[in-house]
Amino acid sequence: MSLKQLPTESMPREKLLQRGPQSLSDAELLAIFLRTGTQGMNVLALADLLLRDFGSLRALFCASKEQFCRHKGLGEAKFVQLQAVLEMTQRYLAETLKRGDALTSPQQTKLYLSSVLRDRQREAFYILFLDNQHRVIRDEILFEGTIDAASVYPREVVKRALHHNAAAVILAHNHPSGVAEPSQADRRITDRLRDALGLVEIRVLDHFVVGDGEVVSFAERGWI
């Protein structure tokens, strides 16, 4: 069936305008992004096929250029367009976080940290440097690789915190395995960093561990 044969209210763009983006399926949202189908396949059918081939929107978004462009109907221009959309989304989340108080919006903080860290193939140790009103001054990835007591250096963390004149920090790292449950090593390095930063009167407000679909907060567990 051609897309033009669908009732007007069932066309993705019209449906979005009438009912809002939340009313659309993943395939319908993707169809709006793709705009056109291929010969013999309308854009909704193409979107549905791509989601079945990749398995999910997330897998599609994480695909390399080679993986993306090998599918009929997708090319370099669409890949560039998708990367721009993803980067704008991440910058929107970062801007939202930096304009507010990180601690009064824990869910926004988790969402932002997940967007930054979740899909990394290697562990990355990330820090939000905060002022005395808990507003974000700067955010940095300080260490990459296996995160344990031997690879995260408290001296470097203290050095960066002093450089930014931070009054407090929020720590975060990802688990590429997808399991967000903190390890004993995670708890030990958190204690070491809290002790080191405490010597210069900089507070560790929280440590988030980012997994696949879950973000664990040390503060919510009562560990900080």
Swiss-Prot record:
Domain of life: Bacteria
Xref: PROSITE patterns: MPN (PS50249), UPF0758 (PS01302)
Keywords: Hydrolase, Metal-binding, Metalloprotease, Protease, Zinc
Residues the entry annotates as binding Zn(2+): 173, 175, 186
Gene3D superfamilies reported for this sequence: 5' to 3' exonuclease, C-terminal subdomain (1.10.150.20), Cytidine Deaminase, domain 2 (3.40.140.10)
Entries under Pfam families matching the protein: RadC, UPF0758_N
Record-annotated MPN domain positions: 102-224
InterPro entries with a match to the protein in the record: MPN (IPR037518), RadC_JAB (IPR025657), RuvA_2-like (IPR010994), UPF0758 (IPR001405), UPF0758_CS (IPR020891), UPF0758_N (IPR046778)
UniProt region (Disordered), positions on chain: 1-20
Span(s) of short sequence motif JAMM motif: 173-186
Molecular functions (GO terms): metal ion binding; metallopeptidase activity
GO terms for biological process, alphabetical: proteolysis
NCBIfam families: PRK00024.1, radc
Family: Belongs to the UPF0758 family.
Protein's name according to its UniProt entry: UPF0758 protein VC_0217
Organism this protein belongs to: Vibrio cholerae serotype O1 (strain ATCC 39315 / El Tor Inaba N16961)
